[in-house]
């Protein structure tokens, strides 16, 4: 069975997606470290807290847990527990109380590398303070350059974030070369304990830079995919489909795309919907498109947070699905014909991604769909 011929809708490997909307460093979660524990782990170590949960299950609500954790941390701070200072700031941060978190982190930044890292995130993203990319970059550099063993687990995440800053020219002079160097450091030869996002972004970088280096792109997407990155798993599917950086292999492509789609990669779902439509597997096409055709723009941030996929690719996937779902409804392919619903989903595709919808419509006019 032949794979579909490439269309203009597949720009993910041919268009630089990082020069548009400014990325947020909060998308890179604070790395875990054996030197530290989370607020919940810290609280659970105390028998008093455990017993309270057991005896009063009616109080086991989020608000009550937060209040209890803050009281417990306050007690530990009084005893001189240095870790409790950071955990209180982190709890503020996770609850969205950014001004309180900023104040707490600034108080302990000279003694706590995780607080320094979080200050870098907050100043860069403008959380609890005015956006100050330069200051955010300075804090990240402090983490990256620190010789202290307690900063070691933060270095890959800091390097990844600094790479993004250099790539986007935010807080520093734009430099793709420096971004690449930092991402390679952060990716650490595919180490699963390093920054998997750096591994994935290298795959995207090498497939969009000029000249393209598709073999490198395939390598890094493979590393990231092996470490659980859904974005790269979908990208590998496309690379196998079109023989980019690897020999064309439709079976491997479909395997990657189905796995990625099953775990929530919306763009992979969109590619599969298009594939099933072109191969005239209309029942399958509709079965897949039904799953996400009713997603809305406001769902994108939540999906991005859950799947760790880039919002722009989620947007494209949703637009593709809406377009092909509309086409099936318009013609009664694999579903009862309904022109009113078809019009709704065509409009939705245009609203989600006007450029992509226009290109798909152009292909339709030229009878390539």
Regions found by a protein language model. Name each.
Residues 141-143, 186-187, 261, 277-298, ...:
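TPR/TPR-like (Sel1-like) alpha-helical repeat modules
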Residues 79-82, 110-116, 125-127, 132, ...:
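Short helix-capping/linker turns of helical repeat alpha-solenoids
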